[in-house]
Structures are given as C-alpha cells and as structure tokens.
C-alpha cells in the first residue's frame, strides 16, 4: 500500500523554506539569555550583605581622619608629624622596624617614607583594614615597637563594634591561613630479602602454598593435580598426595586437628587425614571451580569461595553446608577468616570486597573502591586492619566497617597474592613475576624483586601465584609459574648504612578512594 503524499500550494512551500532558512541563520536559540538587571542587583546586594555585612556600615569620624593646621584635635590613630607642614594637609611618617617605600621601584629614603592621609572616599577601606586593639597594644609595648602617637595624645580608642568584629570575626579568615601540608611519615627500615633456595618437583604451575603450624614442613598444590609436602629446612620432598582430577587451587593445614584441606578446579573440597595420608571427607555443593579456602581460627568451620559467585561455610566435622554467602556478581577469588568481627572477608572479580556476618550469613559491608578484580586479601596478624590487591592498586582498610586507610601504588600488574608479617612487611606477587615489598604503616615500597625463571622455562612463564611467610617469619616462600617454589630470607649483612631508606617526603594527596 502506497502512502499518499499531502500536496501543498507553492505559497506554503515557499514560506516553509523561508522559515527553515530563518531558523538556521537568523534564530538566536544559541545566544545567552539577556541579563535581568533587577535580579542582578538583588544578587549583588545579597552577596554584599553576606560577605561584607559586619563592616559595610562602619562609623567613621572625619575629624579623626582629616585635619587642617597644627595639632588642634586628638588623632585617633596618632602618628608623628613634621613641624614644617603647618597649615597644610597633615603628613605622617610611619616609623618602625620595617619601613616601606612609597611605591614599587622607589628607593627607601626619609622622603619616600612620608605618606599622605587618605581622602574621605578612602576612609571606609582604611577603617576596615585597621588592626585590633590587642595587636596595637602588643606593638606599643614590644621591645622593637615604635610609638605611634602624638606627644600628650590620649591612648588610642576604637569603637566597641569594631573591636568585636576584628577580634571575633576571624572565622572566615581562618580558611585563608596557610596550613602546613601533611607529609608522609618516615618509614621503618627493613632489611632487603634475597633468594635463598629454589625447589623444583612439580610438573605444572604451583598455584597455592601453606606452612604447617609446627613450622617443620609446608604443602603446595599444583596444576599437575598433585599436592606435595616438603621439608621446610632442607627443601626435600616428603610426600605426594593424589586425588584431585584438576588443578589444585587452595591448600591449608588445620591448627586444631591433623587435617589438611584442599580445593580445586574440579569443584571438589577435600579433607585429608595426615596420619593416614588419605581423604576422609568431601564437601559437596559448589557448582564450579573452587578458587580458595580458609579455616576459622577458633571454630571448626571451613570457608570456601568459588567461580559460581558464592562462598560457602562448612561444618568441618559433619560436612554440612552452614551458609551459602551469595551477593557477589562474579567469581569469588579469595576468602579470609578471623576471630573478630567481621569474621569472613571475600574479594571478587566483580571488583568488590564484602565483609560478612558469620552468624546471619549476610553481608555487613560492601567495599566498592576497587575498579578491577580483587584477587588477593590479607589480614594483618597484629593490627585490626587488612589489605586487598587489584591491578589498579593495593588498598589498606581498617575493621570493622572497612574504613579506607591508604593506597599503595606502583605495582602495575595483576596482583595474585599478598602476605604480611608481624614486622609490618607486606609482600605483593604479580602475574609478571615481580614481587614488591612494602612498609605496612607508611606504604613505602622498599624493595622490588624479579627472580629469573628456572632454566628450560619460557620467559612468559614468569609469574607468582601464591606466597606465604613461615611461622618464624624469617623465610618467605613463593609459588610460581615456572613450576618451582622459591625461598627468600632477609639479608643478614644489610644495615641501614649499606641499604638506606630512599625516603623523599611528599605532600600527601587527599584521595577519596
């Protein structure tokens, strides 16, 4: 069906074309709205009243500001006079410890220090700029002050209203005073860490690491689907555990029982009895890969996080799922537990951190400051604070409500892991194989490490997936993409003189987040 076009007369078409031309070239749609004089006057009057109301109508005395002939009246603001100026406008000589010339570029001489009194039109501005009575008294009685009055003149008296304004009206002016900018506190000196040992044995990426409470051995999980137990002192392999059918993503050793817990990309969470070296419990419920796990320090509770956007709380003994913590909109990459509230902290690929109520199984606080995935969270062992790692920044927070403390900028990579010890050394490991060490209190980056990959590995397989301090905090262990575990320890020969703190105080920028 063809739609009929309505026909118009030539007269109508011409005038429509003319209107379009006027709208394009003559119309004033883009011009600013003309100024309304009446509203502009009211606006200026209100501004004057608000800003200058207290001093807008000051009482001025013409006799005190201008006089003819000899000294026939008391000068309200006394100055010394020249006797040669009898019968003329009185000229004043301002004397004191800091004389000023009459204008810029004028040499400072006895003549150029003479200033003529202001005219009546300038009297108002002079009255506003008068000093307070307290300041005049201090100048008059000070050791280097000058006498600003005529011989025999009475003490300077100022109107009561002016006194109250100048003495109490410093509220607005206080914002104009220069305040000392806060500076970064000096960081504590920490000895540098150096590579001590490289342990090889896994056939795939080493994805997780944990040290047992007795500090005798440590355990690692790998992409080769095995869990290996190593002697901490010698670095020798003690035991290999097989059972997972995909990459092992998390391991942890219980402090309350001889159990080892592991999780992997096969959706399985296993409990291993280390007396028999076999699996005694499975925890079923996650719908996708399990990325991390942690044990509650005082309760028999296990918490796991998964790619299915949930974290689950398990009863260790009964294998029952106590709570399913739902709220994240993407994979939950890391989880941490503590005895104090909030007892569970999760970080997710949806860029948020959530603090959970363990009893209710609900979110207490959601932190949205990060702009990219949060892959690592670490709790300080002594302070009531924690840190989170993301490709945009490392951020420090304080419990219980997640108050922001500071940013630790400079590690420009995807941060996979964080670790901190009681001395305040924070370690961040990234996917490009770099490891940065920070002072926890000040956020000062005192060392950067990029260890060489194991011979035979590709350079692209340089990456740190996990790191942990041993129980004595004298050794740092890293799980890396070149299929090795690297052990670092402090350089015992280093001193503050050989490795000084390169501390350059900066003005701290007040950042919102």
Swiss-Prot record:
Record lineage: Eukaryota, Metazoa, Chordata, Craniata, Vertebrata
Record-linked Pfam families: WD40
Underlying gene: Plrg1
Ranges of the WD repeats in the UniProt entry: 201-240, 243-282, 285-324, 327-366, 369-409, 410-448, 459-498
Keyword Nucleus on entry: yes
PANTHER family with a match to the protein in the record: PLEIOTROPIC REGULATOR 1, WD40 REPEAT PROTEINPRL1/PRL2-RELATED
Name of the protein this chain belongs to: Pleiotropic regulator 1
Function: Involved in pre-mRNA splicing as component of the spliceosome. Component of the PRP19-CDC5L complex that forms an integral part of the spliceosome and is required for activating pre-mRNA splicing. As a component of the minor spliceosome, involved in the splicing of U12-type introns in pre-mRNAs.
Subunit structure: Identified in the spliceosome C complex. Component of the PRP19-CDC5L splicing complex composed of a core complex comprising a homotetramer of PRPF19, CDC5L, PLRG1 and BCAS2, and at least three less stably associated proteins CTNNBL1, CWC15 and HSPA8. Interacts (via its WD40 repeat domain) directly with CDC5L (via its C-terminal); the interaction is required for mRNA splicing but not for spliceosome assembly. Component of the minor spliceosome, which splices U12-type introns. Within this complex, interacts with CRIPT. Also interacts directly in the complex with BCAS2 and PRPF19.
GO cellular component: DNA replication factor A complex; fibrillar center; nuclear membrane; nuclear speck; nucleus; Prp19 complex; spliceosomal complex; U2-type catalytic step 2 spliceosome
Homology family: Belongs to the WD repeat PRL1/PRL2 family.
Gene3D superfamilies assigned: YVTN repeat-like/Quinoprotein amine dehydrogenase
Positions of region (Disordered): 60-79, 136-160
Domain of life from the UniProt record: Eukaryota
Residue positions, PTM Phosphoserine: 119, 200, 390
Localization (cell): Nucleus; Nucleus speckle
Organism of this sequence: Mus musculus
InterPro entries according to UniProt: G-protein_beta_WD-40_rep, Prp46/PLRG1-like, WD40/YVTN_repeat-like_dom_sf, WD40_repeat_CS, WD40_repeat_dom_sf, WD40_rpt
Keyword Nucleus applies: yes
Modified residues (N-acetylmethionine): 1
Keywords: Acetylation, mRNA processing, mRNA splicing, Nucleus, Phosphoprotein, Repeat, Spliceosome, WD repeat
Annotated GO biological process: mRNA splicing, via spliceosome; positive regulation of G1/S transition of mitotic cell cycle; protein localization to nucleus
């Amino acid at each position: 069906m063809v739609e009929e076009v309505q026909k118009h007369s030539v007269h109508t078409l011409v005038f429509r074309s003319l209107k379009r031309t006027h709208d394009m070239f003559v119309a004033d749609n883009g011009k600013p709205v003309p100024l309304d004089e009446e509203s502009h006057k009211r606006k200026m009057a209100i501004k004057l009243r608000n800003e200058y109301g207290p001093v807008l109508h000051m009482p001025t005395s013409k006799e005190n500001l201008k006089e003819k002939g000899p000294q026939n009246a008391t000068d309200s603001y006394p100055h010394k006079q020249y006797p040669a100026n009898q019968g003329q406008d009185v000229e004043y000589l301002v004397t004191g410890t800091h004389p000023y010339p009459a204008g810029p570029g004028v040499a400072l001489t006895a003549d150029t220090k003479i200033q003529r009194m202001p005219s009546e039109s300038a009297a108002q501005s002079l009255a506003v700029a008068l000093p307070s009575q307290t300041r005049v008294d201090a100048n008059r009685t000070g050791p280097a002050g000058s006498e600003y009055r005529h011989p025999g003149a009475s003490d300077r008296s100022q109107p009561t209203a002016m006194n109250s304004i100048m003495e109490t009206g410093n509220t607005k002016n206080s914002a104009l005073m220069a305040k000392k900018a806060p500076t970064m506190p000096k960081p504590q000196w920490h000895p540098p860490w150096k590579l001590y040992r490289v342990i090889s044995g896994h056939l795939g990426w080493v994805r997780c690491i944990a040290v047992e409470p007795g500090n005798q051995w440590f355990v690692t999980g790998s992409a080769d689907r095995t869990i290996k137990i190593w002697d901490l002192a010698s670095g020798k392999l003690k035991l290999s555990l097989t059972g997972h059918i995909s990459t092992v993503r998390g391991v942890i050793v219980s402090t309350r029982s001889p159990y080892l817990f592991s999780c992997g990309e096969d959706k399985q969470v296993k409990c291993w009895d280390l007396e028999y070296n076999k699996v005694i419990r499975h925890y079923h419920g996650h719908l996708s890969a399990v990325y991390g796990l942690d044990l509650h320090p005082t309760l028999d509770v296990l918490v796991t996080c998964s790619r299915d956007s949930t974290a689950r709380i398990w009863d260790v003994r009964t294998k029952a799922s106590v709570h399913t913590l739902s709220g994240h909109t993407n994979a939950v990459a890391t989880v941490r537990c503590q005895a104090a509230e909030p007892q569970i902290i999760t970080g997710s690929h949806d860029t948020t951190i959530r603090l959970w109520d363990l009893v209710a199984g609900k979110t207490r606080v959601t932190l949205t400051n990060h702009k990219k995935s949060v892959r690592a969270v670490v709790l300080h062992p002594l302070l009531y604070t924690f840190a989170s790692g993301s490709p945009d920044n490392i951020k420090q927070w304080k419990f219980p409500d997640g108050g922001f403390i500071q940013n630790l900028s400079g590690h420009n990579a995807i941060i996979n892991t964080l670790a901190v010890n009681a001395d305040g050394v924070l370690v961040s490991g990234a996917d490009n194989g770099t490891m940065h060490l920070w002072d926890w209190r000040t956020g000062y980056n005192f060392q950067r490490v990029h260890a060489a990959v194991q011979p035979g590995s590709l350079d692209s397989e340089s990456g740190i997936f996990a790191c942990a301090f041993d129980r004595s905090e004298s050794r740092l262990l890293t799980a890396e993409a070149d299929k090795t575990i690297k052990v670092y320890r402090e350089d015992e020969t280093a001193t503050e003189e050989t490795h000084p703190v390169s501390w350059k105080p900066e003005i701290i920028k007040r950042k919102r987040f």
